[in-house]
């Protein structure tokens, strides 16, 4: 009696050449088939399992609008070119990412899939396809430490241009140095970014705005230096400039001119007596006995102060004990009552010296006015550029949709 073995389930392997496979349209490589052909596992029910390993390359659109806080979506579409849905039915399964190795530049967010059917004019049957969307988020730690943070620090250094004194001679040098540094970082960004004109990257917008701020700071610095080193012979400050800068802007910035808070001289009223400790002269001295020192001191003592003469002093607050009209008459061409030629010559010399000092005082006043205007412009630009820099930094960088997520995950 013979015994027969009945196998209810068995499987064997076949070469891929012995089986029919469908032509798919998921390849975007220079080679048409990027898979490695392995044997097909066939069981007794006719089920065939074919798992060829392969590297699939796909062409996808890269959106650099939010670089380096961008999220990219690449689609992998699997379908058949030769067989429709009546001959070949594609079913979608979830993508297995258990063997995914983390990357230092990208984070794999997910691979969602979607099955769709498409109808063509030539055929009545549908053509199914399965599309997997690979969603990746760029890790921003590298770009933040090497590009963003240095750019923020350099833009902060640009504000120091307005704090540097004009007499140092380094305001223009500092501004140009900061501008060149930003240009170097801009070139680094251009090397990293793909050559596309579809959109302006976020980091390029930030660098461009920072370079505009630094460039304007250099222009303003030139104006400030022109104000600070203004030639007094070039004319006085225009009225509108004086009103805007020295009055309105100075009041808004709480700035005061040098010497504005000084204590006023002691002799201000008619009834107050004034005397100079360094000048002691006798009122009984006759006019012919006067010398050049007396007249010089009488003119340059305290200019512009009018006081009532004291009975025991011939000099009051730096002026002679005579009326202002009499002083001006002597210093502006008037002849002394005695007609002494020596005294006339002395008065002529005193008149020249007085005019010289008066011109020097006027030149110093004009220079001081222009220098104060330069300080006001510096302070005003420091405030305005600081606010503009903060607004640009926060507004541009935080406009990225996943800015908070990127900072919390990459910089934590």
From Swiss-Prot:
Transmembrane annotation, as ranges: 144-164, 172-192, 205-225, 240-254, 380-400
UniProt membrane topology term: Multi-pass membrane protein
UniProt xrefs under Pfam families: Neur_chan_LBD, Neur_chan_memb
This protein's UniProt keywords: Membrane, Transmembrane, Transmembrane helix
One record GO biological process: monoatomic ion transmembrane transport
CDD domains: LGIC_TM_cation (cd19051)
Superkingdom of this protein's organism: Eukaryota
Family to which this protein belongs: Belongs to the ligand-gated ion channel (TC 1.A.9) family.
The protein's name: CHRNA7-FAM7A fusion protein
Gene source species: Homo sapiens (Human)
């Amino acid at each position: 009696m013979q015994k027969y073995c009945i196998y209810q389930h068995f499987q064997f392997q076949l070469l891929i050449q012995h089986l029919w496979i469908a032509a798919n349209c998921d390849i975007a490589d220079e080679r048409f088939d990027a898979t490695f052909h392995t044997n097909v596992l066939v069981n007794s029910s006719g089920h065939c399992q074919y798992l060829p390993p392969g590297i699939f390359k796909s062409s996808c659109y890269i959106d650099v609008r939010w670089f380096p806080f961008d999220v990219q979506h690449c689609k992998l579409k699997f379908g058949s070119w030769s067989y429709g849905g009546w001959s070949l039915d594609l079913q979608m399964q979830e993508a297995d990412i258990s063997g995914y190795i983390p990357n230092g530049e990208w984070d794999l967010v997910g691979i969602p899939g979607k099955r769709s059917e498409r109808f063509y004019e030539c055929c009545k049957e549908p053509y199914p396809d399965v599309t997997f969307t690979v969603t990746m988020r760029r890790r921003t730690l590298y770009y933040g430490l090497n590009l963003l943070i240095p750019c923020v620090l350099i833009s902060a250094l640009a504000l120091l241009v307005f704090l540097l004194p004009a007499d140092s001679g380094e305001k223009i040098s500092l501004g140009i140095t900061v501008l060149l540094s930003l240009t170097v970082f801009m070139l680094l960004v251009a090397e990293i970014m793909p050559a596309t004109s579809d959109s302006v990257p976020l980091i390029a917008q930030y660098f461009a705005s920072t370079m505009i701020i630094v460039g304007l700071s250099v222009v303003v610095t030139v104006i400030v230096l022109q104000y600070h080193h203004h030639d007094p012979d070039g004319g006085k400050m225009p009225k509108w400039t004086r009103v805007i800068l020295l009055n309105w802007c100075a009041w808004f910035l709480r700035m005061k001119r040098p010497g504005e808070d000084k204590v006023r001289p002691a002799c201000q009223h008619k009834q107050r007596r004034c005397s100079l400790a360094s000048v002691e002269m006798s009122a009984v001295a006759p006019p012919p006995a006067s010398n050049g020192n007396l007249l010089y001191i009488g003119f340059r003592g305290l200019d512009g102060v009018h006081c009532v003469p004291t009975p025991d002093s011939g000099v009051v607050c730096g002026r002679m004990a005579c009326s202002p009209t009499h002083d001006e008459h002597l210093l502006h061409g008037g002849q002394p009552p005695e007609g002494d030629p020596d005294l006339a010559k002395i008065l002529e010399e005193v008149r020249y010296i007085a005019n010289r000092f008066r011109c020097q005082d006027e030149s110093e006043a004009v220079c001081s006015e222009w220098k104060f205007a330069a300080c006001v412009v510096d302070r005003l630009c420091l405030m305005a550029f600081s606010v503009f820099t903060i607004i640009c930094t926060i507004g541009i960088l935080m406009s990225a949709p996943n800015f908070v997520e990127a900072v919390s995950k990459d910089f934590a």
